[in-house]
């Protein structure tokens, strides 16, 4: 007669807990304390952020700025303001006492323009690498030092593999840059989290050939960055600002197409003034009027009974000359919208229903989404621009 196969019974009750405690002790011995932990054991602080220097973008990001220890991708067409957004973040990090690094793979950083945006160029670490491998190796070493608060790589498209640089014109190097990015991001992600460094990758757009439906636009460097990025921002120039016949800047729209730290698909619109960068005061005025903090009567802007100026430009200049007032109005905006340090905690949340209407073009991010399968009432009708 064949012998019956017996299996060892799983430990029960206290025995299971003892077995788990023994396993955890062994793991901590081999890999260090904190290698495994219960999620509820540690009172984790809110996600730390680096302000973008732009009130509208801080609000769209949902947490008051770029998350620390995460990867951020900023992409868009040429001359849309991508580098300007990154330089403003560097300026804010430096103002808070942080150390910033800029990997200038495009060899196009303008120190004079950076200074006008508030960047301390004397303290800014800059590298102009020869190859993509060198750029990413330098970035990885800086992150692992634990001393860098913000790292900007400009741009992914300019991270040219060594084999391509040393090869002949016309040689095929299919997928080489994508493999390079995938390997680098696998190495850097954990180091970024441990060091609290924010890494901003600036990327360019390309067009896929033969696309019949949906957007033909895609970003360079393969798909790895799309997966590893906690935040992806699409930056577009939507309008030229003029003073009479002279162009003085651009109206820019930034759409948060991916956000792992807050609800995505929010949109921020702001002004970029030539030679000055993003106008923080202009964003404050727009948001304050929208939220009833600043009153607009005709062309006059009024705050708590005091006139800020006639016309938006004069009100903007007044706030620029009185930064304390601008800070006060900005704080009231953040408080009203519950952004950053004013975000509601679990104890403050209510059961009142909240209606969200995402500003999203469904052709932009997820081509496999089928709206017909969504529950009734999931979406409201939105009007998109041509």
UniProtKB/Swiss-Prot annotation:
| Gene3D superfamilies in the cross-refs | P-loop containing nucleotide triphosphate hydrolases
State the compartments where it is located: Cytoplasm
Q: Report residue spans for region: Disordered.
A: 362-386
Task: Report the principal subcellular site.
Answer: cytoplasm
Q: Which GO terms describe its molecular function?
A: ATP binding; ATP hydrolysis activity; ATP-dependent DNA damage sensor activity; damaged DNA binding; single-stranded DNA binding
Q: Does the keyword Disulfide bond apply?
A: no
Q: Which GO terms describe its biological process?
A: DNA recombination; DNA repair; SOS response
Gene Ontology CC: one annotated term: cytosol
The superkingdom of the source organism is Bacteria
**Record keywords:** ATP-binding, Cytoplasm, DNA damage, DNA recombination, DNA repair, DNA-binding, Nucleotide-binding, SOS response
Which SUPFAM superfamilies does the UniProt entry name for this protein?
Answer: P-loop containing nucleoside triphosphate hydrolases (SSF52540), RecA protein, C-terminal domain (SSF54752)
Q: Which Pfam families match?
A: RecA (PF00154), RecA_C (PF21096)
Q: Which residues bind ATP?
A: 76-83
Similarity comment: family membership: Belongs to the RecA family.
PANTHER family from the xrefs? Answer: MITOCHONDRIAL DNA REPAIR PROTEIN RECA HOMOLOG-RELATED, RECA
Q: Which NCBIfam families match?
A: tigrfam_recA
What is this protein's function? Can catalyze the hydrolysis of ATP in the presence of single-stranded DNA, the ATP-dependent uptake of single-stranded DNA by duplex DNA, and the ATP-dependent hybridization of homologous single-stranded DNAs. It interacts with LexA causing its activation and leading to its autocatalytic cleavage.
Q: What is the protein's given name?
A: Protein RecA
In the UniProt record, what gene is named as encoding this protein? recA
């Amino acid at each position: 007669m064949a012998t019956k196969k017996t299996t060892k019974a799983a430990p029960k009750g206290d025995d299971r807990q003892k077995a788990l405690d023994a396993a955890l002790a062994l793991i901590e011995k081999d890999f260090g304390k904190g290698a495994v932990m219960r999620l509820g054991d540690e009172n984790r602080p809110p996600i730390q952020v680096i302000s973008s220097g732009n009130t509208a973008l801080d609000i769209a990001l949902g947490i008051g700025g770029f998350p620390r220890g995460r990867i951020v991708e900023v992409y868009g067409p040429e001359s849309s303001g991508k580098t300007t957004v990154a330089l403003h973040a560097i300026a804010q990090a430096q103002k808070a006492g942080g150390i910033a690094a800029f990997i200038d793979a495009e060899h196009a950083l303008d120190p004079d323009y950076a200074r006008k945006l508030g960047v301390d160029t004397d303290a800014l670490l800059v590298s102009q690498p020869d190859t993509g491998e060198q750029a990413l190796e330098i970035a990885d070493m800086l992150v692992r030092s634990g001393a860098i608060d913000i790292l900007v790589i400009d741009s992914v498209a300019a991270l040219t593999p060594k084999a391509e640089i040393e090869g002949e014109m016309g040689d095929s190097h299919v997928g080489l840059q994508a493999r390079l990015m995938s390997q680098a991001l696998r190495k850097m992600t954990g180091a970024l989290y441990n060091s609290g460094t924010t890494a901003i990758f600036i990327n360019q757009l390309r067009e896929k050939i033969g696309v019949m439906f949906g957007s033909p636009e895609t970003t360079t460097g393969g798909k790895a960055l799309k997966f590893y990025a906690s935040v992806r921002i699409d930056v577009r120039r939507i309008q030229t600002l003029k003073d009479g016949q002279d162009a003085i800047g651009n109206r820019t729209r930034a759409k948060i197409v991916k956000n792992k730290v807050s609800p995505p698909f929010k949109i921020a619109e702001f002004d970029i003034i030539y030679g000055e960068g993003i106008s923080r005061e202009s964003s404050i005025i727009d948001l304050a009027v929208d939220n009833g903090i600043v009153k607009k009567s005709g062309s006059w802007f009024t705050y708590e009974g005091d006139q800020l100026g006639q016309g938006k430009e004069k009100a903007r200049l007044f706030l620029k000359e009185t930064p304390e007032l601008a800070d006060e109005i900005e704080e009231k905006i953040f408080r009203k919208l519950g952004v950053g340090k004013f975000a509601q905690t679990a104890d403050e949340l209510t059961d009142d229903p909240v209606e969200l209407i995402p500003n999203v073009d469904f052709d932009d991010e997820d081509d496999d989404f089928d709206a017909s399968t969504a529950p009734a009432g999931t979406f409201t009708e939105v009007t998109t621009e041509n």
